[in-house]
């Protein structure tokens, strides 16, 4: 067996499949593009769905890749097991309607066992297969596999909802009896017992059926094109090749672990408890790659995942004695390890470090708040003479403050308390169920559309013409090809078309189709790309259409022109964003419509009004310079040498289209554009907002719509000026400032009057002192405008020795507000309010001397006041 580095293993995989005529598909971004069913790219096949469902036909039906992926469903196992990771690489080879079972198994065995390639010992390999899949069993036997190494497993059938499915055969590497202390042997595989002896290194999915959840598996229809979909975990394969005890002892992780040793002063012991080292090493890989691919920490979606990973890593750093920001210092090491295939981490190192460090610094403040909460919880337990920290509180520490359960348990035990593991798991399960309920349903590859996939007639798009004559090649109605049509809605393919198919964020052209007499026979309402690249025109039929006949196609010129204004302006906006807020502001989505443009980009905070002003001004400067817009077609390498910006998540072929706006903007783009920036007229930003963690959106308008937006603002300003009786609009600001000054004076006077009134009221309330069990208390309902007035009462109460305890209740709007203050060491205000608040259907808490609660049942206020004595 060869000793190979991780880079060599990855490259050997790609080289082998390239030798079998596979095209190497570059690794896609971790953030999915145009796939709402996925939070992350989570497998090697995730980016190839379009090929397997037939919506796009690949240039080469044989594909191989090394794809970075993120999965966080087993985050709690990371660091505990030898092979769980949040970020990993999946090596794959794929056949889209080309070779099938025979070649997949034969070539797979060759790659693993040939001395030219991985050279793994044949007697160390075991395979599982679906019991009904006798063909796979026979292929393995033909390869020379011992029958005792072939294990039938009922679960070896791959399907996720509707779409491609089929049996799979998994390959395992036997690491020997050192990893099988109970000497169970192959039964570990046959009975699916969790173990470290038999390591799954590869899964070959034989996709031959269109799964239909409505029928039994035996009734699944055969796919028109059978596929191969495989996945081999790089980390596991490297661990096998390097003879490592766990994945973490390979060259993918050990350099990171060595850096953690330097930062912590602790030593990694392969045979000891190294969970914190492993968690940090794993999580910083995920953070580095995800942030580099445009995701940013936040409170929802993938941003929440990153924040959780970072906080978990920070807490494990603290367990190692690292109490200052340190994760950002590991980013260069991650970049160097992966540089040979993933240079993007080092290329974006400064930005990634900045985001990680900033998030660490923010979390440092949160940790203090969480520590204070834990201290309070433990103090409350002690006061209540309880010995167990409740599961819901452990979960709140975990979910809100990022405290790992192990750390909470350790701190609680140090203080003499146990923790409620069962309650924590119940709270965790509730959250997971809520998360699953919020996930967009989907994820299967979709049913193959054979009719569209089988369109082979050539069709070209003519950028230069807005009208032309062209022969009708294909008519599709109700998913069937027909020769003629005279009514309804159908799909058409022409040999040549001036109609732009929706793509790259630009909406499709609309227009008319006419016969040789000039009569309109169809209205084009949409244009989309067919699997083989043809333009599919969706039309409302108004006359007679027949295959083989030539028709006159003309687009809606005004619509196209308005869309082009917005598309060219989008390129200017993208460049301006880079210049004003930084190169990290990469495109995360765009829409070039008729009436507006929408641009999504990665950024970690709201764009300030001043920055928006600069961006808007810079775009308009480029418009007024009347810069020519040029387009050329060239190969991808030449385009990169020109400095062309490749858009986020896009895949490009060998030949690309480069759109240049002078030297201000150079982008790869297949859309339609103006000839000169001056044609845009004017550009105006109408809105900037956050649409998700780390993603901002700008909505803007151009030309006529921009003029109308400015006119609308002017009309509003005139109306305000009239209301304020300002003769000139430039006097509006001064008038508003004057009104604000008057308002502040009135508010101050009002506050002073309230304070005087409160003092008078307090004098009456503080006279009503009662006593129980030797404690003097005041309990009263008061009439106040807001909860702040309750605190004012409490402040006055503290100034003199009126009583030991104060309880005030106020009904404000639809809410009941309760305040408890205590001067007695025997009465904890926070505990007392927890007992009283439920009476008014509320909840609350606080410190020993002051606590507040909110409720909703005003009818129970008298009951709450009466209950004060019972709880003292």
Swiss-Prot record:
Please name the HAMAP family in this protein's record.
Answer: Ala_tRNA_synth_B (MF_00036_B)
- What this protein is called in its record is Alanine--tRNA ligase
Top-tier EC class: ligase
Which Gene Ontology cellular component terms are annotated? Answer: cytosol
Among Pfam families, the record links this protein to: DHHA1 (PF02272), tRNA-synt_2c (PF01411), tRNA_SAD (PF07973)
The UniProt note on the cofactor reads as follows: Binds 1 zinc ion per subunit.
Q: Which reaction does it catalyse?
A: tRNA(Ala) + L-alanine + ATP = L-alanyl-tRNA(Ala) + AMP + diphosphate
């Amino acid at each position: 067996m060869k000793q190979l580095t991780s880079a060599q293993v990855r490259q050997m995989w790609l080289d082998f499949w390239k030798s079998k005529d596979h095209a190497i598909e570059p690794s896609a971004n971790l953030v999915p593009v145009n796939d709402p069913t996925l939070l992350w790219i989570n497998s090697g096949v995730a980016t190839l769905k379009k090929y397997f469902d037939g919506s796009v036909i690949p240039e080469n039906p044989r594909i191989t890749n090394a794809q970075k992926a993120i999965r966080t469903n087993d985050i709690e196992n990371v660091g505990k097991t030898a092979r769980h990771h949040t970020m990993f690489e999946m090596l794959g080879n794929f056949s889209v309607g080309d070779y099938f079972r025979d070649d997949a198994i034969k070539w797979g065995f060759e790659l693993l066992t040939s001395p030219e390639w991985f050279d793994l010992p044949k007697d160390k390999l075991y395979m599982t297969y679906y019991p009904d899949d006798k063909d796979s069993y026979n292929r393995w036997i033909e390869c020379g596999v011992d029958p005792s190494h072939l294990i039938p497993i009922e679960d070896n059938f791959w399907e996720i909802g509707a779409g491609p499915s089929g049996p799979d055969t998994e390959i395992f590497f036997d690491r020997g009896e050192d990893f099988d202390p109970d000497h169970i042997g192959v039964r570990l595989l046959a009975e699916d017992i969790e173990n470290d002896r038999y390591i799954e290194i590869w899964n070959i999915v034989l996709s031959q059926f269109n799964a239909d959840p409505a029928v039994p598996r035996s009734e699944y229809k055969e796919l028109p094109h059978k596929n191969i979909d495989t996945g081999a975990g790089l980390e596991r394969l490297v661990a096998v090749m390097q003879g490592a005890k766990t994945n973490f002892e390979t060259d993918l992780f050990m350099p990171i672990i060595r850096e953690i040793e330097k930062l912590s002063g602790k030593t990694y012991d392969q045979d000891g408890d190294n969970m914190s080292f492993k968690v940090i090493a794993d999580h910083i890989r995920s953070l580095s790659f995800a942030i580099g691919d445009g995701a940013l920490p936040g409170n929802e979606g993938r941003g929440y995942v990153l924040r959780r990973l970072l906080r978990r890593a920070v807490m494990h750093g603290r367990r190692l004695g690292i109490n200052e920001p340190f994760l950002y210092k590991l980013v260069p090491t991650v970049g160097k390890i992966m540089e040979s295939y993933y240079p993007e981490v080092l290329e974006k190192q400064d930005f990634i470090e900045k985001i990680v460090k900033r998030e660490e610094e923010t979390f440092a403040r949160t940790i203090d708040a969480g520590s204070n909460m834990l201290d309070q919880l433990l103090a409350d337990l002690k006061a209540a003479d309880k010995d167990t920290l409740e599961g819901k509180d452990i979960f709140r520490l975990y979910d809100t403050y990022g405290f790992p359960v192990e750390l909470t348990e350790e701190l609680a035990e140090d203080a003499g308390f146990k923790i409620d593991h069962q309650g924590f798991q119940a709270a965790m399960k509730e959250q997971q169920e809520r998360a699953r309920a919020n996930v967009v349903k989907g994820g299967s590859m979709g049913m193959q559309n054979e009719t569209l996939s089988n369109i082979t007639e050539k069709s070209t798009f003519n950028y230069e013409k807005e009208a032309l004559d062209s022969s009708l090649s294909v008519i599709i109605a109700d998913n069937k090809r027909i020769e003629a049509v005279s009514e309804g809605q159908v799909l058409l393919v022409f040999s040549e078309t001036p109609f732009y198919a929706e793509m790259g964020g630009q909406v499709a052209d609309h227009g008319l189709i006419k016969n040789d007499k000039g009569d309109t026979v169809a209205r084009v309402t949409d244009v989309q790309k067919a699997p083989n690249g043809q333009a599919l025109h969706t039309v409302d039929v108004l006359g007679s259409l027949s295959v083989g006949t030539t028709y006159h196609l003309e687009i809606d010129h005004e619509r196209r022109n308005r869309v082009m204004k917005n598309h060219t302006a989008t390129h200017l906006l993208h460049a301006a964003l880079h210049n004003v807020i930084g190169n990290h502001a990469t495109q995360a989505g765009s829409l070039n419509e008729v009436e507006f443009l929408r641009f999504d980009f990665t950024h970690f905070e709201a764009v300030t009004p001043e920055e928006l002003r600069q961006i808007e001004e810079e775009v308009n400067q480029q418009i007024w310079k009347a810069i020519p817009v040029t387009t050329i077609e060239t190969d991808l390498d030449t385009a990169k040498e020109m400095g062309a910006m490749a858009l986020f998540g896009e895949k490009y072929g060998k030949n690309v289209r480069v759109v240049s706006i002078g030297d201000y903007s150079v982008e790869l783009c297949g859309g339609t554009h103006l000839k000169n920036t001056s044609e845009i007229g004017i550009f105006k930003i109408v809105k900037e907002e956050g649409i998700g963690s780390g993603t901002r959106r700008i909505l803007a308008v151009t030309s006529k719509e921009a003029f109308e937006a400015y006119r609308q603002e002017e009309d509003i300003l005139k109306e305000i000026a009239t209301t304020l009786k300002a003769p000139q609009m430039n006097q509006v600001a001064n008038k508003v400032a004057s009104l604000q000054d008057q308002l502040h004076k009135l508010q101050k006077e009002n506050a002073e009057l309230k304070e005087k009134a409160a003092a008078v009221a307090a004098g009456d309330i503080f006279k009503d002192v009662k006593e129980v069990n030797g404690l003097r208390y005041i309990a009263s309902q008061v009439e106040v405008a807001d909860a702040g007035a309750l605190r004012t009462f409490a402040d006055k109460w503290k100034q003199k020795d009126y009583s030991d305890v104060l309880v005030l209740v106020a009904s404000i709007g639809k809410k009941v507000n309760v305040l408890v203050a205590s001067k007695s060491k025997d009465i904890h205000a926070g505990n007392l309010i927890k007992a009283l608040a439920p009476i008014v259907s509320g909840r609350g808490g606080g410190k020993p001397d002051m606590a507040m609660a909110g409720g909703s049942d005003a009818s129970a206020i008298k009951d709450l006041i009466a209950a004060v004595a019972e709880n003292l």
